[in-house]
Curated annotation (Swiss-Prot):
This is Large ribosomal subunit protein uL18. GO terms for biological process: translation. The gene is rplR. SUPFAM superfamilies: Translational machinery components. Part of the 50S ribosomal subunit; part of the 5S rRNA/L5/L18/L25 subcomplex. Contacts the 5S and 23S rRNAs. This is one of the proteins that bind and probably mediate the attachment of the 5S RNA into the large ribosomal subunit, where it forms part of the central protuberance.
Length: 119
């Protein structure tokens, strides 16, 4: 499968899952984006069109993180989970954004679950 087909497949899955799982204030959407070297995660309220929280491996507090990409992803998941629990959010809808539930995406989800998020 070539690069163009992979991108088209991911876009198709992304739009299908976005239509299915809408985030609200009580149960926001945990949206993951993964680039080759970084990982980004946001809590999105689709009803009001607002970003409630966001954490990435590029943010100032995470600039000096050492370890493998999976270890960093697990740390990012724990951080978003802890911040969400502090705001009173415990239930979320997990949006893997068309990426396979494997590797860094799975590590981020495991870290968020360890911090207390339910999905």
């Amino acid at each position: 499968m070539g690069h163009v087909e992979k991108v088209a497949r991911r876009h198709k899955i992304k739009t299908r899952s976005k239509a299915r799982g809408q985030g609200t204030v009580e149960k926001p959407r945990l949206c993951v984006f993964r680039s080759l070297s970084q990982i980004y995660v946001q809590l999105v309220d689709d009803v009001n069109g607002a970003i409630l929280l966001s954490v990435s491996s590029m943010s100032k507090e995470n600039k000096g993180l050492k370890g493998t990409k999976c270890d960093i992803s697990r740390t990012i998941g724990k951080q978003i989970g802890e911040k969400a629990v502090q705001k009173g959010i415990t239930k979320v809808v997990f949006d893997r954004n068309g990426f396979r539930y494997h590797g860094r995406v799975q590590a981020l989800a495991d870290g968020a679950r360890e911090a207390g998020l339910v999905f």
